[in-house]
Amino acid sequence: MDEVGVLTALVEEYSPSGHEGDAVQRFIEVSRSLGFTAHADAVGNGIARIGEGRPSIMFLGHIDTVEGRLPVRLDGDRLHGRGACDAKGALAAALVAAHRHDGPGEIVVVGAV
């Protein structure tokens, strides 16, 4: 899955505050497709891990959005949709960067509810 595919997959899931469950499941599916181990923790946050050992680095972004559905569309090199830049865009960037990282250590990406 390329960068645009990762972002599109996350943005396509509607996730207004308090109703993030489906978006967390999508985050987990996307993470696993990139080679992460991933699960939801006890409060519903999506936790994705790749690599092992030290150093350990964590990226955290919120997965909820404001209410109101917007159509997801690609317009040239811009993806439009709820959460594309706040903060699903940052989560997508963290997942792709961690997936491509070939150095030592563990990277944890958290999609917080």
Name every feature range the model reports, one short phrase each.
Residues 1-58:
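N-terminal helical capping/dimerization or prosegment-like subdomains
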Residues 42, 111-113:
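A general secondary-structure junction signal
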Residues 54-111:
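Active-site metal-coordination/substrate-binding segment of hydrolases
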